[in-house]
Amino acid sequence: MAAEAAGGKYRSTVSKSKDPSGLLISVIRTLSTSDDVEDRENEKGRLEEAYEKCDRDLDELIVQHYTELTTAIRTYQSITERITNSRNKIKQVKENLLSCKMLLHCKRDELRKLWIEGIEHKHVLNLLDEIENIKQVPQKLEQCMASKHYLSATDMLVSAVESLEGPLLQVEGLSDLRLELHSKKMNLHLVLIDELHRHLYIKSTSRVVQRNKEKGKISSLVKDASVPLIDVTNLPTPRKFLDTSHYSTAGSSSVREINLQDIKEDLELDPEENSTLFMGILIKGLAKLKKIPETVKAIIERLEQELKQIVKRSTTQVADSGYQRGENVTVENQPRLLLELLELLFDKFNAVAAAHSVVLGYLQDTVVTPLTQQEDIKLYDMADVWVKIQDVLQMLLTEYLDMKNTRTASEPSAQLSYASTGREFAAFFAKKKPQRPKNSLFKFESSSHAISMSAYLREQRRELYSRSGELQGGPDDNLIEGGGTKFVCKPGARNITVIFHPLLRFIQEIEHALGLGPAKQCPLREFLTVYIKNIFLNQVLAEINKEIEGVTKTSDPLKILANADTMKVLGVQRPLLQSTIIVEKTVQDLLNLMHDLSAYSDQFLNMVCVKLQEYKDTCTAAYRGIVQSEEKLVISASWAKDDDISRLLKSLPNWMNMAQPKQLRPKREEEEDFIRAAFGKESEVLIGNLGDKLIPPQDILRDVSDLKALANMHESLEWLASRTKSAFSNLSTSQMLSPAQDSHTNTDLPPVSEQIMQTLSELAKSFQDMADRCLLVLHLEVRVHCFHYLIPLAKEGNYAIVANVESMDYDPLVVKLNKDISAIEEAMSASLQQHKFQYIFEGLGHLISCILINGAQYFRRISESGIKKMCRNIFVLQQNLTNITMSREADLDFARQYYEMLYNTADELLNLVVDQGVKYTELEYIHALTLLHRSQTGVGELTTQNTRLQRLKEIICEQAAIKQATKDKKITTV
C-alpha cells in the first residue's frame, strides 16, 4: 500500500510538473538535505517502489500494445534508413555542384563575352526593325491623312519623331527622313485645326441646310403657290436648342458620356461619320502634338471671320433657293427672303454653338488630364462664342436695316411714298388675290442643251462649294449689289417688321444660354432696343410727317381728292380726301407696326393718337376756313353748332332713316304724315329761330366749291371714323381673347392701357361728330339759301302789279334760288351718297312752302297778277325740286293753294273756310285775310275788318270742335 501510495505521489508529481529532471533534482535535494538516515532510506524506498511500479506498468503496456509497438519500431527503422540515404545523396549533389562551380568558374569570361554580344545583336536588330518601320512612316502617314485617321497619323508621327530624335539621332542615313517628319509634325496641327474649323462651321451647318431642304421638299408637296415660304405668325416659339444629338449617330454616345481618354479611332469606319467623335479625335491629336494653346488661339482669332463666311454662304443659299422658286430679288422687294436668311442663320449659329460646346468639353478634358503635360492653358468659353455671334448679327442687321441711311436720301420710302395719281393707294388697299400657279405652255428645261448646261453649272457649283465651303452663285448670283456687299432684299428700316419676332426669340435663346437674369440684357437686345427707340421710331415718324404734311400743308387740302382707281379699290361710291386716305393709311401702317413690333405698341399707339389729333386740328382749321367769315360763323354753321338745333335735327326721323337704306327701314303706318310732321317741326324751329331778319350775302356760303369741300370732308371723316373704329375694336378684341384663343394668334401684344383706348375712341368719335356737323351744315345751308332769297321776295318784291309781260316772268330771286339749288344738287350728287343727298333735299319743299306762306304777312299789297306770278314762282320751284328729289313735292301745292285762295274776297275767304274746312293755321288765315284787306278795295272800315277776323277765329274753333268730335266718335266705335 505504501508503495502504491509512493508511486501515486510520484505520478502526481510528474503529471503536475511534466518534467522528470525536475523531479529527480527534487528527490536529490530531499535526500541531500535530510539529516535523518531513516528519512533518506524511506525516501529511497519510496523511490524504488515507484520505479518498480513503473516497470510493471511499462511491461503491462508493452504486453498490451506489443503489436503497435513492433510496428512503430519497424517504421522508425525504415524512416531512419531513408533519411540516411537522402543525406548521402545530398552530400553527393553538393560535391557535384562544387565540381560544376569550379568548371563554370573556369569558363566565366568566355560566357560573359558571348552574353554581351547577344545583347548587342538583339539591340541592333531592334534598331533595324525600327528604322525599317520609320522608313514606311511617310507612306503610312499619307494614307492616314488621306483617309482622315488623324489620331493614328498623330501617334505614328509623334513616335517616329521621338525615335529619330532619340535612339536614332546618330544615324546619319536618316537625316533627310528626320527633317521631313519633323516638318510634317510642325505643320500637322495646322491641318488638324483646319479640319476642326471645317467641322465647327461647315459640317455642323450642313446638317441644318440638309434638314431645311428636306422640310422644303415636304412643304412644297402640300403648300399652295399663294402661301408664303415663311409665315412670321407661325414660327415655332421658342426654338429648341440644338443639342449634341445632332453631332452623333444613332448608336454613338453623347458628348457627356465620352471622355477624351476613352476616345479610340476605328480604322475600319469612316472617321467623319460621327462629327462629335471626330472632333474629339482632332482635339486628342492636337493635345498629343502639344498644340492646344495654338488651337485655342486659332479658334478665337478665326471665330468672327468664320461666322461671316456662314453669313455669306447662307446669303447665297437663300438667294439661290429664291432663284430656283422663280423669285427675282433684284426686282421685287423681298424682306421675306431676309426672314428666311435669318431663320437659316439662327439654326446655323445654334449648330455652331453646340459644336463649340462639344469642343470646349474636350479642351477642358485636356486641361484636367495630364495628356499634354502643359500648365496654365487659358481656354475660351461659350460666352465668347455668343458674343461673336451677336457681333456678326449686329453687322448684318446694320446693313439690312440701312442704319447708315445710304439709300433713304436717294430712294423714296417703300412704305409711305405715294404719287398724286393715287395708283399706289389702289395698290395698297387692293385685296390681295391668291396667286394662281401659271401653267406654262412649254419649257426648255428638259432639252438636251438645258440638261447638259444645268448639269455643268451644278457640278461647277458643287466643286467650288466642296473646295471652299462656300456656295457659289451664277453670273449675277440673284443678289442685290450694295457697296461691295450682296443682299437678298433691298436694305431698309422696314425690314425690322418682318424679322423682329424671330430675332427676339433668338435673343431670348442667347440670354437663356448665357444664363442672364431678367435684369441683364445681352448686347444684341441692347442693340435692337437702341435701334428701334432712337432710329426706327424717329424714322417712321419722319416718314409719316412728310407724307401727311405733303397733303395737309397745301393751300387748299380739302380740294385734293383721291382718283377713281383708289375709290374703286376702297369700295367707296363718292370721292374721299387724299389727306384722309393718307392718314388712314398711316394709322393702319402704325397698327401693323404695333403688331410687328409688339414690344413697342404703346409708342405706335401714341403716334396714332398724335397723328389723328393733328389731323383733327387740320380738319377743324379747314372747316373754320370755310364756314367762318370775318370772325363770324355763317348762319348754317352757327345753327349746326347750336346744341338745341343739332339735337332736334338728329332726333328727327329723316336723320335716323339716313343711317339705314330705305328698303331696310321698318314699315310704319302713316309714315308720310309722320315725316311731314317732322318736316313741319324743323321748318317751325328754323323760321322761329331766324325771325323776319334778312340774311346778308356774307352769312351764306355762295361758293358751291365750299359746299362740295364740306361734302367731301363729311364723306372722308365718316369713312375715317368707321375705319378707325373698326381697327380699334379689333385691337381691343385682340387684347381680350381667352388663353385658348390666344394660343392660335402669335401677336404677343401687351395689354393696351385704358387711357390710350379711351383717347382713340374719343378721336374716332370726334371725327364722326365732325362729319355729322358737316352734313348738318350742308342740310341747313340749303335751307338758309331759301331764307336768303325768299324772305326778300315778300318783303321787297312788288306783287301789286297789273297784267303785263313782266307779270309773266319769274321773280329774279326765285331764279337765283333755283340756280343755287341746282348747282348745290349737282355738287352734292357727285360728292355725297344717295341717302345723304336725299337727307339734304328732303323736306326742302315743305320749308319753302312755309317760308312762302309765312311771307304773306310781309306783302304790302298783292294783285291778281301778283298772285299769278307767285303761283308761277311756286310752280317753277316745285318743278326744280321734283327733278331733284324725284317726288311730287306736294307741300308746294299747299303753298300754291294758299296764294290761289287770295283770288277770293275777304267774305268769300270766310265762306271757303267753312265749306272746305281748316287747311292752314289760324295765323296763316289771319295773314291771308289781312293781306286781302290791304290789297282789295271796298273791304270796309277797320271795325268790319276786325269783325271778319273775329268771325275767322270762330269758324276755326267750330271746325276744330267738329274735327275733335269726329275723332272721338271714331275712337268710341273702335
UniProtKB/Swiss-Prot annotation:
SS bond list: none
Positions of modified residues (Phosphothreonine): 233, 237
Descriptive protein name: Exocyst complex component 4
A GO CC term assigned to this protein in UniProt: cytoplasm
Sites of N6-acetyllysine modification: 9
Similarity comment: Belongs to the SEC8 family.
Keyword Acetylation on entry: yes
